[in-house]
């Protein structure tokens, strides 16, 4: 009975990835998305003597990061990282889209923001949305989405980033970053 009740829980669809949803199992994700370019297991540092913060060691948390290169997203190509919880359920998606200039970065930011807003409003269980400015210079957007029948909001951040150290690789200097996650 409990198993069937868990299977009937509606999942929250990710924006820009219509075949993916939060809490999706690792197996289902791999069936839809295929093999990752790289899989990384999260490690954290702890101390054997916590009182004095001595004798550090690393341990695996069980969280997994699936990295994909050359992901096509609304006419743009970038790289994506999907984060899975300790119970191996999808909890976050991050996409980096490289652009060639600051001007192109602003154009892509505006286009993606409008596309994301339309996709949010088209979700079948869409209820409401608020938009805040985010980013170092308040030059990005945070869409806080409330869905019917859900207690937790999910947020989508769309903002420009700049790598100051990327002098040689000009096409990697400017990017647009899109994060999707649920607020607890």
Region annotations inferred by a language model:
Residues 13-19:
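Short, recurring structural edge motifs at helix starts
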Residues 139-184:
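An acidic-aromatic pocket/loop used at catalytic or ligand-binding sites
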Residues 7-9:
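Bacterial signal peptide processing site
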Residues 64-72, 95, 143-147:
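Short beta-strand segments that buttress and anchor functional surface loops
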Residues 37-71:
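N-terminal, post-signal-peptide region of Sec/Tat-exported proteins
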